[in-house]
Amino acid sequence: MKLSAEGLKDRAKWEEAGYALPKFDREKVTEATKENPFWIHFGAGNIFRAFQANVVQNLLNDGILDRGLIVAEGFDYEIVEKMNHPHDDYTILVTLKADGNIEKTVVGSVVESLTVNTENASDFARLKEIFAKDSLQMVTFTITEKGYSLVNGKGELLSDVEADFVSGPEAPKSYIGKVAALLYARYQAGEKPVAMVSMDNCSHNGDKLYAAIHTFAEKWEENKLTDAGFRAYVNCKEKVTFPWTMIDKITPRPDASVEELLKKDGIEELDPVITSKNTYVAPFVNAEECEYLVIEDAFPNGRPELEKGGLMFTERETVDKVEKMKVCTCLNPLHTALAVFGCLLGYEKISDEMKDEELKKLVETIGYKEGLPVVVNPGVLDPKEFIDTVLQVRVPNPFMPDTPQRIATDTSQKLAIRFGETIKAYAASDELDVKDLKLIPLVFAGWLRYLMGVDDSGKAFDLSPDPLLTTVCPYVADLKLEEGQDVESAVSEVLKMKQIFGVDLYEAGLAELVCGYLKEMTKAPGAVRETLKKYV
């Protein structure tokens, strides 16, 4: 059994092995899509293959759509060359359910794949042709938050971007430069309307995409490299929009145990490829069953009925509320709490932590008792139900190979938004008292204990990458697992850092509590567990 148009001709064999196959006429859909494309997506990675492509497949199966997707890859061309083309753009989606069941789907809704490479003349000409089509309604992106940045870590323009500003839209080298050049082709074809939709997992993502594209339009116009009206076109909401979205679905890298499962079914040529850009890609993707995509409904050229595939369309303010609900209360804070204590207690899978009574109670209390009273309720999703799903379905899912070590990455950048907003909301409330927060301060103390790089049994471990490690680790460098230390003197400066906690913990009235917890957790090996038992 081979994953290709030829290999899928023997449908009975695939169906016998438990695979759901496309139910539509793919040749007909391919022809219609190439002639009148409505949706092109940039970023041929796992999230797109597991989420957007599957939504479109379901709508094609139900006869709601008659055209599929075109995908373009601009960061790593080998994904298209080594994965899409050899498999005729088919993907196997393995949905790993919390109840132990596995769903296997052959996704065939992607019918054309291209590289966003100006040196590949035929691909780039085809992209320009797609962008000039009246039928094009939406251009979507999963290129990571970094993909929208025109500067490096020091704030200096990236060299490709700088070169593109002066060479213009003919043959740009930078990713956003190429996208801007394609949008310029649409402008030249008659200022045709389109929605440019970032679907990356970052706050106000549409603004990030707009800022990057607008900068190119501005520079090119200043340097007289485009027609004078291009910038006005990018700025005209009746013609080009940059909707905000909130996406949530975990798609870990292809897992070896899933690969074995598919091999047992008799599927050949499943080997993952590690590209020269270090992308780990396979003919299959594995993902959790839960998925959320909330989109600001701003589509100047119309859009298909994607809500019939489970996507939610609403106004910008609601997208923002959903984002805040997830990031500040209902998912991300719970992940961080489990990450910090998971590393300290020697866990290697997040799902295993939900079998730990103290840790389970810790996140339940942070979510339901401390977070929910101040949650931003978006209306389109119920916050309590969202937490229910996180704690009962998503995090305990044994098939999701997520680790506390991965989630602990960059914790210093996450605490302010994930916990600081709740503290501020308590401080601003007439009914609530910051001093009622008992377990959020415990997570802060847990993080400081984590920075010692010694687990609860006294064994050293590697800290996950974090840009502030060199800043904060020296404060805990002299702490040991023994009684009688002056913990507060060691960490008082850190507790004042608003950029880490979102507030000065002394001003908020929580510093004493954090120091007390940290003192208890550094008494001896085993003290982290004892502290959890005592306070959770």
What do the predicted segments below correspond to?
Residues 1-42, 46-536:
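Substrate/ligand-engaging "lid" and interaction regions
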